[in-house]
Structure formats: C-alpha cells, structure tokens
Amino acid sequence: MSLIEDLKALKATAVARINATEADVEALRVSLLGKKGELTALLKGMKDVAPEERKTVGEIGNDVRQTITTLLAQKKAAEETARLNEQLAAETIDVTLPGSAHQVGQPHVLQQIIDEIEQHFLGLGFEIIDDIVDSPEVETDEYNFERENLPKDHPARDMQDTFYITPEILLRTQTSPVQSRSLEKHDFSKGPLKMIAPGKVYRRDTDDATHSHQFHQVEGMVVGENITMADLKGTLLSIMQKLFGEKHQIRMRPSYFPFTEPSVEVDVSWNEVTPDMKPEDIEWIEVLGAGMTHPNVLRMDGIDPEKYSAFAFGLGPDRFAMLKYGVDDIRQFYLNDVRFLSQFNRKGN
C-alpha cells in the first residue's frame, strides 16, 4: 500500500475513532498527532517518496492533520459543554428564593435624636454649626468662660468641673462658645442670626446613671432686633412637641445662668395635656435651661445690646433619649452593646 493510501486510511479511521470515543480527547490527540503518533510515523516515510509525488503526499498529510485537529477541538468543546450542563443541572438555583439577609446598620440612638433636632430647626430657618473651625472641642478659657460672662473669679465657675489641658486651654464644658464665634462672623445686614450648635462636651463628673464625663449638647441662639421671651417660648414649645408629641406642653420657671438674663428652667409635661385637665394633674419634668442672652455677652461679641436682643437655650440629646425611650442609665448609650442599641430602629421609632 502506498503512503497516500495509508494517509487516507488513517484519516478515515481517525474520524471514526474521534466520533466514537468516550475517552480522554487529549490522550487520543497524542496517539494520533504526538511525536510518536500514527500520523507522525507515516510522514516519516516522506523520504522514500519520489520527488514528483512529495507535493501531493504533503498536501494529503496536511489535510489529514487539519481534519484530525479540527475534529478533536470540536470533540473537546462538546465534552466541556456537556460537563458544564451536567454541573449546572446538579447545582440548579431557584432564583425566586430570597437571598441571605444582611445586617443593616443604623445611626446610634443619640445621633437619631440629634438628627431629629437638626431637621426641626432647619425647617425653622436655623443654620447648623458643627465644623471643627467654629465648633472645636478643645477650647480656650476665653471662649468657654469669659465670653459667657464667667470671668476667672466668678463663683459660678465652681458649678462646672473642667478638664484643663493648660491654664488657658480646656475641653469645652458647653457648646456655648460656638455662639461667640458665630456672632463674630455674622453679617446682620443680611438678617438675624439663627443657629444651633450640636456637639460633645466634657465635665469632670463621676460616671453614674445620670452623669457622664462626656455627653452631647445642642446650643441654640437667635440674635436680631426685637427678639423677645415669647419668641423663645414658641421655639422651645415647637421642639418639645416635635420630640415628645403635640399634646405635651412646657412651662418656664425663673432660674439663674450667668450668660442669660432673665434665665429660666424649662419643664415639659410628662403626660399629654388636654383642655379639661386640671393643672395639678399635669406631671412636669425639667429638661433644659434657657433665657434672654445677657447684654454683657452681646457686648463681648461686638453686638450692641441697645439695638439687638437675643435668646439662647441648651438642649441635652442624651437626656431627651433617656426620657423618650425610658432608659434609666445614661451609661447604656456608651457601652456599644448592639443588643441594647438595636432596639432603637429609626424606622420603628
């Protein structure tokens, strides 16, 4: 049999073997096309072919190689497709089933209260000042005390134990200094100043159920012409009803703060007030301090108290959260116990 006939015979048998094989395609490729494969062995006989037949034999040899290579590639692709389909069938996923639930975070309960306060005052036209430039937590004695009508020898300084860093630098005990910094920059030709300043403050208190060395405060202030105590009362009533409900009322009691005159303590009704309720049936709880800004405070900030008047107030988000949710220990807010904090879901409250 001539080499041409041998090549044609190999092509026919190779096609049949490839189509019928269930074995490893790679092993079949090696047996046909490898260095010791059947086609390679036949083509070694090219040296014995007459020169005039070598071209024809070479073309037939290339055709056999190409045919085998193409069929092997198709067979391999078909096997891979079949294997993938089998795998997909075995790993069928019902896309209608719910996915794995992911735990979703939420703002801390104190941040929720602060956000609620901020949104309310934004609706009243107030600006929020809480940046590090105008609301630093490390403050000077001048802004924290002296600008608030508390000179170095003032007895009211004993009311606040302070974390001093140096004799003139301290951790602020209140957010009131933000008022002074805001007044220094405000252009009253554009209208009155209406601002709140939320932030952390620090006192040298012993931590217990109602005290913390660090807590939150929201200072508020309105400065303009003809600002009265009635404006203060209306403002405070609106935020108390926002936090506790529209049927709650407030009352003001005379008090003393160095930076306001007159000064008041503000109580909110613990129970809802109805028109037919007797005064003695209303339960009151103290929630904040406020008053008309002292003329000395305005003067130290470059404001003429003969032309402008102002009111100021200080809200305690920590205390509001305790009252609103019936929490009896302020330390619970700072222990990072997710079991406790997860109760205060913003959507659910």
From Swiss-Prot:
Protein EC: 6.1.1.20
Binding site for Mg(2+): E261
UniProt name for this protein: Phenylalanine--tRNA ligase alpha subunit
Subunit structure: Tetramer of two alpha and two beta subunits.
Biological-process GO terms, alphabetical: phenylalanyl-tRNA aminoacylation
Family listed: Belongs to the class-II aminoacyl-tRNA synthetase family. Phe-tRNA synthetase alpha subunit type 1 subfamily.
Note accompanying the cofactor annotation: Binds 2 magnesium ions per tetramer.
Species in which this protein is naturally found: Leuconostoc citreum (strain KM20)
A family per Pfam: Phe_tRNA-synt_N
Organism classification: Bacteria, Bacillati, Bacillota, Bacilli, Lactobacillales
Coiled coil regions, renumbered to chain: none
UniProt-recorded Gene Ontology molecular function terms: ATP binding; catalytic activity, acting on a protein; magnesium ion binding; phenylalanine-tRNA ligase activity; transferase activity; tRNA binding
HAMAP family, A to Z: Phe_tRNA_synth_alpha1 (MF_00281)
Gene name of the record: pheS
Keywords: Aminoacyl-tRNA synthetase, ATP-binding, Cytoplasm, Ligase, Magnesium, Metal-binding, Nucleotide-binding, Protein biosynthesis
Main location: cytoplasm
Tree of life domain: Bacteria
